[in-house]
Design a protein with these regions (language model features):
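Long, low-complexity, compositionally biased intrinsically disordered regions
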Residues: 1-118
Length: 118
């Protein structure tokens, strides 16, 4: 997979997460508007691309979209207690994951233009 295909797959995955859980987890979605990030970046390794974020309250989030078959293809992780105790097994996003997705979506055009320029 080249970088453009990885970005397209990642875009589809984060859109799917938001559409699937936006109404179901509405309170978490609304609370995500208050989350602020200390650092946030995207790593485009061909086999294991991911988006990473760390909030001001030091919780760490990671959205992974793997391209090889012997591991879980898509995975979300957060270090907050709400996600670890209630949502981890179901792979349901917490407010921090929703905030990370929203941050990624706001930078999507810039990322696409950067990839096209390479």
């Amino acid at each position: 997979m080249n970088k453009h295909e990885i970005i397209q797959s990642l875009n589809q995955y984060v859109d799917q997460i938001v559409e699937q859980y936006k109404h179901e987890e509405f309170t978490r979605y609304v609370k995500s508007k208050k989350v602020t990030f200390e650092e946030c970046y995207m790593f485009l390794e061909p086999r294991d691309p991911f988006i990473f974020g760390q909030t001001k309250s030091r919780w760490k989030q990671k959205i992974t979209f793997r391209t090889y078959k012997h591991r879980m293809q898509t995975e979300i992780k957060c270090s907050c207690p709400d996600w670890n105790h209630n949502l981890k097994g179901k792979q349901v996003p917490c407010k921090h994951i929703f905030a990370l997705i929203e941050r990624y979506q706001s930078k999507r055009n810039h990322i696409n233009n950067t990839i096209k320029g390479e």
